Curated annotation (Swiss-Prot):
The keyword Repeat applies. Residues 64-264 are annotated as: 12 X 16 AA tandem repeats of [KRA]-K-[KEM]-[CKA]-[AEKD]-[EA]-[ALE]-[AMK]-[FKAML]-[KQA]-[EQKA]-[KQCEM]-[ECLA]-[AEQ]-[AEQ]-[EQAKV]. It comes from Drosophila hydei. One of its GO terms (biological process) is sperm individualization. This is Axoneme-associated protein mst101(3). The gene is mst101(3).
């Protein structure tokens, strides 16, 4: 009823224009054209049934459009959600990958640090071993040098001792030679004196027999005295020689004992160093 009044008041082209505004589909004859598949072109009718059909179809078309838009929005929302979830998963995967790479780098750095520390310790151990070997070699060289110096010192001491002994022996020999020379000179002098006395006695015997006899007695007494003195001197010289020989023997014994003590001390020192 209301629709018939509405159609009777407004011209057909106005109503069609109004419907076209709602549906957005109008042909050149001002006929409504639905955008849905089930809507067909139809001429505008003044009848109530046709108006209701049009209204119903328009409402259905609007509902379908609204449903399509809602479905589209839901689809877009689902797509957005799906994309967001995919992006989130990609982001999480990237974060995991980043964390894994960081952990790998940290592990590699720790391994490198550990290897470097191990290499450093090995290097320090090698240097310590090298230093210990060098110190041992230096100690051995010092001990060898010390032994060589001790041996050289002992050799020098022995040479000096031999030289000193040779000098003493030469001095003793010289003294003995001088003493023998003095004894020989004394004996020669005695012989000369005896010859002179004999000659004088013979000459005096020619002059005075009594004087010769008396002088002979005096000469014999003097000769006895001189012989006693010479004998005494010879005994003193022999005693002196004996004392010098005893002193030399004692000196040689002391030198041998000193050498023996030095060898014993050297052997004891060598035994201590070996232990």
């Amino acid at each position: 009823m209301l629709l018939s009044r509405f159609t009777s008041v407004f011209p057909r082209n106005v109503i069609v224009r109004g419907v076209s505004t709602l549906t957005s589909h109008v042909d050149r004859n001002y006929l409504v054209r639905s955008s849905f598949d089930k809507c067909q072109r139809f001429p505008f009718s003044d009848s109530k049934q046709e108006a209701e059909d049009v209204k119903k179809k328009c409402e259905e078309a609007a509902a379908k459009k609204k449903c399509a838009e809602a479905a589209k929005k839901e689809k877009e929302a689902a797509e957005k959600k799906k994309c967001a979830e995919a992006a989130k998963k990609e982001k999480e995967a990237a974060e995991k990958k980043k964390c894994a790479e960081a952990a790998k780098k940290e592990q590699e750095a720790a391994q490198k640090k550990k290897c470097a520390e191990l290499a450093k310790k090995e290097k320090e151990a090698a240097e310590k071993k090298k230093c210990a070997e060098a110190a041992k070699k230096e100690k051995e060289a010092a001990e060898r040098k010390k032994c060589e110096e001790a041996a050289f010192k002992q050799k020098c001491e022995e040479a000096a001792k031999k030289k000193k002994e040779a000098k003493k022996a030469a001095e003793l020999q010289q003294k003995c030679a001088a003493l023998a020379k003095k004894e020989k000179e004394a004996e020669m002098m005695k012989k000369c004196e005896e010859a002179a006395k004999k000659k004088a006695a013979e000459e005096a015997a020619k002059k005075k027999a009594e004087e010769v006899a008396a002088k002979k007695k005096a000469d014999e007494a003097a000769a006895k005295k001189k012989c006693a003195e010479a004998k005494k001197k010879a005994e003193e010289a022999a005693l002196k020689k004996m004392c010098e020989e005893a002193a030399l023997k004692k000196m040689c014994e002391e030198a041998a004992l000193q050498k023996k003590c030095a060898e014993a001390a050297k052997n004891a020192k060598k035994t201590d160093s070996e232990t």
